[in-house]
């Protein structure tokens, strides 16, 4: 009898492990459409399938947020919308979306990865304005979900990589603009992020000027990134002029697209997310407010 019980023990442990894993996967895969009936003006494209291969996703016609919930035991109440890069032609959803979200979860921050419409994709029907509508709607939508997901509305930020950094910057520096087609209760909410994180942001991120009401900002790039280190330097100068808090990390090497540093052979880049974690803590963003 004892032998039978012992033989069942590994099976029970394995079953419990699988249940935990599948529960985590189900939680990670919670997809929230930005508009229940599809993007305004493009409702008929809502059910067109996305294309995904290896590291990219494209043909996004029903923009959405994928919610990654921080473990309840360490949840701080903060949240961030993550905009992956991809040159507005594709989305680097895993390396610049899901990986970033899981890191945020590890330090107690809820994360929403944005799938936005791509205005440079081949044969696209979308414009830059449609892309802006997506990121503005995303911020307002997260605000509308704050009570349900136990999010502190004073600590909702935006993070972007490369082209996604341009979206984050459009939101942070132009949050007072509307960028919606039809009004509903969600569109009445503020689009202003409480903080922004720009990782090798594209050149379209740079505004004409930085307002004193712009959010506190974390900037990071490699100096040998000829595309996307210049915007970081320019934004630093603009933030200093406006006296808006900013922290900058400019690495000697790394070029473009090192993502969360996982595959980098450079120690400095491999550990860059820890610099972000330090800043989030020092800024009071990731400090628990239970």
Feature locations, PLM:
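C-terminal catalytic histidine-bearing segment of alpha/beta-hydrolase fold enzymes
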Residues: 243-290
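Short beta-strand element of the alpha/beta-hydrolase
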Residues: 76-85
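N-terminal cap/lid segment of alpha/beta-hydrolase-fold proteins
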Residues: 27-74
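Short amphipathic alpha-helix adjacent to the substrate-entry channel of hydrolases
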Residues: 93-112, 237
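Primarily recognizes the serine-hydrolase "nucleophile elbow" in alpha/beta-hydrolase
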Residues: 133-214
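Catalytic nucleophile-loop/oxyanion-hole region of alpha/beta-hydrolase
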Residues: 92-93, 117-149, 262-269
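Conserved alpha/beta-hydrolase "acid-adjacent" motif
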Residues: 226-233
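Short beta-strand/loop motif that positions the catalytic acidic residue
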Residues: 218-221
